[in-house]
């Protein structure tokens, strides 16, 4: 009897081990395949963006040169990869001198047409009209399209890739409550905390202030505008209704008091002080992923738009 029970237990363990091995193999295979596809899209976007930048530079140099002023470089164009300041205009507060050094400014063209699609996103949007933008954090794997669907299925891309195939990784996505084009006062983007370091896994590095000091900027483009955000708070909270901070439910503040309370809560929960406090009228971005030190935890990186 004991021997028979032992055999049964061994068989159960073998089956459980085999099932786990199959799951992990499928998990990492799917992740690797999806990451390769995302890398191809990122490379395509980068190439088209670079070609656009070069064409704009060429057009600028081919036009009639303006009269040179004392101390000015007559070949210099007015091209500004950062666009215009945010509502509060705190460039001195939001940017450090090092971040404003030319070698630290990425070649990211700005086309704020308000209606025309940025040309480097046109092809991808034609492939999947659910694409609403592009998210990038430099020196990380975060370089992905951002998706959005209707209210009847707001989490559609939680476990679907860009091509709408089932995927453990899913896509980076915004729920329908957020309007990225208006934009809403706060836009929350969701992504998985993948074991292979892809999707939003990198966000966990912001638990350490040194990561924020070295890499505080987030680049989030809509289909029509390019924008830069700077992280002002990093925190964790419970995702259970009625327990944690419901940051994801705030899209448009009813008034200045509600906006300020939202910012204050983000900063109260923050692991460290960044010295940045957004003001009413600024536009915010929250990146949300799973956090495993608390039950149903969420790890959130909150940023304010600076261009």
PLM regions: where:
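N-terminal Sec-pathway targeting helices
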Residues: 1-16
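Solvent-exposed, non-transmembrane regions of membrane-associated and secreted proteins
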Residues: 20-307
């Amino acid at each position: 009897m004991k021997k028979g029970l032992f055999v049964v237990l061994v068989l159960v363990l073998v089956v459980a081990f085999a099932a786990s091995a199959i799951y992990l193999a499928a998990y990492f295979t799917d992740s690797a395949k999806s990451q390769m596809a995302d890398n191809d899209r990122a490379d395509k976007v980068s190439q088209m963006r670079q070609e656009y930048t070069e064409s704009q530079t060429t057009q600028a140099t081919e036009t009639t040169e303006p009269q040179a002023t004392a101390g000015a470089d007559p070949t210099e164009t007015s091209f500004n990869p950062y666009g215009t300041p945010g509502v509060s205009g705190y460039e001195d507060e939001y940017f450090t001198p090092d971040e404003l050094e030319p070698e630290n400014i990425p070649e990211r063209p700005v086309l704020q047409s308000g209606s025309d699609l940025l040309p480097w996103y046109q092809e991808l949007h034609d492939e999947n009209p659910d694409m609403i933008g592009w998210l990038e954090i430099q020196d990380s794997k975060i370089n992905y399209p951002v998706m959005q669907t209707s209210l009847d299925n707001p989490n559609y891309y939680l476990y679907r890739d860009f091509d709408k195939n089932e995927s453990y990784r899913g896509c980076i996505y915004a729920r329908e409550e957020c309007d990225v084009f208006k934009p809403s006062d706060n836009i929350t983007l969701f992504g998985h905390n993948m074991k292979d370091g892809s999707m939003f896994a990198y966000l966990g590095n912001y638990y350490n202030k040194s990561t924020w000091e070295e890499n505080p900027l987030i680049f989030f483009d809509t289909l029509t505008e390019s924008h830069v955000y700077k992280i002002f708070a990093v925190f964790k909270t419970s995702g259970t209704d009625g327990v944690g901070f419901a940051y994801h439910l705030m899209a448009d503040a009813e008034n200045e008091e509600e906006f300020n309370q939202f910012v204050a809560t983000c900063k109260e929960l923050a692991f460290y002080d960044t010295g940045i406090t957004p003001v009413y009228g600024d536009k915010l971005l929250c990146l949300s992923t799973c956090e495993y030190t608390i039950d149903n935890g969420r790890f959130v990186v909150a940023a304010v738009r600076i261009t």
